[in-house]
Regions:
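Short, acidic/turn-prone active-site loops that include or flank metal/cofactor-
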Residues: 18-20, 79, 97-100, 152-156
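Conserved phosphate/ATP/ADP-binding segment of small-molecule kinases
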Residues: 57-145
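Short beta-strands and strand-loop turn motifs
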Residues: 14-16, 41-49, 76, 94-99
Length: 226
């Protein structure tokens, strides 16, 4: 994927190519490698669309193998791939509102509706549902918690790009979980990483001092009384 930035007119041009193709042998080799190296408690991130040639159940197969190893899968994909993969019960899913609407089959126009939709997947066995609200933050749901997390004050810098913010969010969450941080601390780090990415020339290359600065401004509002 290529992103061209035209600063003079504040415009981005996105070039998306199909990418490489894989064979069934390639897919099986990757699953075998995951089986061989994955340990209990590990975090595996499955992100983006499937490569050409991969089975529509490829992510679901990986999730199943990881569950057998007591590893945690963070799933960040969309469309039919998300619908198929979520049935294998990853540890965490991160749809945006439109992707959640596609999963549920109807519009979600309020935070309460989004919360109810997220809780459907919690009841099915997904442990964490993170619904991205774009600039308005995220709705984060587990069996015991329901929170709206957002950045209360942006740094006084020029925004560069939104490309990679979702990846930075997932990366921050994964790091926090790997460090056994609390759910609240994981959300704060995830939001801080995603927000810091707005000011980065390279997607995902966030500056730790800026992440720390933003983290102190992240707010968590309970949604339990919605």
């Amino acid at each position: 994927n290529i992103t061209l930035q035209t600063a003079a007119i504040d415009q981005e041009t996105h070039i998306r190519t199909p990418g490489f193709a894989v064979t069934e042998t390639d897919s099986l080799a990757l699953i075998h490698k995951i089986n061989r190296h994955t340990q209990p408690g590990d975090i595996i991130i499955l992100s983006g669309s499937l490569p050409r040639g991969a089975s529509t159940h490829f992510y679901a197969d990986i999730i199943t193998h990881c569950r057998h190893k007591s590893a945690r899968v963070f799933l960040d994909t969309s469309g039919p791939n998300m619908a198929t993969s979520v049935q294998a019960l990853p540890f965490l899913i991160k749809p945006n509102v439109a992707e959640m609407e596609a999963l549920i089959g109807h519009r979600l126009t309020t935070n309460k509706a989004i919360l109810n939709a997220a809780q459907c997947f919690i009841r099915q066995g997904v442990e964490v549902v993170i619904v991205s609200l774009g600039k308005n933050g995220i709705i984060a749901v587990t069996q015991t918690e329901a929170l709206l997390a957002y950045c209360d004050k942006l740094p006084s810098q020029k925004l560069i790009t939104t490309v990679g913010c979702g990846d930075a969010l997932v990366g921050g969450l994964a790091l926090a979980y790997q460090q056994n941080k609390s759910f609240a601390e994981a959300l704060k780090l995830g939001i801080a990483c995603a927000t810091a990415n707005l000011f980065s020339q390279e997607p995902g290359m966030v500056a730790p001092p800026l992440v720390d600065e933003i983290k102190s401004t992240v707010k968590l509002d309970s949604l339990k009384n919605l």
